[in-house]
Curated annotation (Swiss-Prot):
PANTHER family: DEHYDRIN XERO 1, DEHYDRIN XERO 2-RELATED. This is Desiccation-related protein clone PCC27-04. Keywords: Stress response. Pfam families: Dehydrin. It comes from Craterostigma plantagineum.
Length: 117
């Protein structure tokens, strides 16, 4: 007897052979223990992409996670070229006023050039 497509692939109700061959997800055993009623599990799909920045090859075929500092250095512009020390501006005190003013790099250079005072 031939089955029509509507009978064979009834989307409204699962067929008995489908129901018997695949147990429901909430009854499947889980590696972490049994699940209670109403709990669902989900797994994230993971790719083996070599462009991932969250892990590196450990040299023995396995993977290891990168330290947070290393990840941050990769994301910063200019790479991990070196450490920044000090500030761009300097605080100086004038003899007359006694107040502090910040000078930028350009102002310091202009002060050192002859004929600019």
């Amino acid at each position: 007897m031939a089955h029509s497509l509507g009978e064979q692939y009834d989307l409204g109700k699962p067929t008995e052979e489908h129901h018997e061959s695949h147990p429901p997800a909430h009854q499947a055993p889980h590696a972490g223990g049994e699940l209670g009623a109403g709990q669902k599990t989900s797994q994230l799909a993971r790719s083996n992409s070599s462009s991932s920045s969250s892990s590196e090859d450990d040299g023995q075929g396995g993977r290891r996670k990168k330290p947070i500092k290393e990840k941050v250095k990769e994301k910063l512009p200019g790479g991990a070229g070196g450490k920044q020390t000090g500030e761009c501006g300097t605080t100086t005190t004038t003899a007359a006023g006694g107040h502090e003013e910040k000078k930028g790099v350009m102002e310091k250079i202009k002060e050192k050039l002859p004929g600019q005072h």
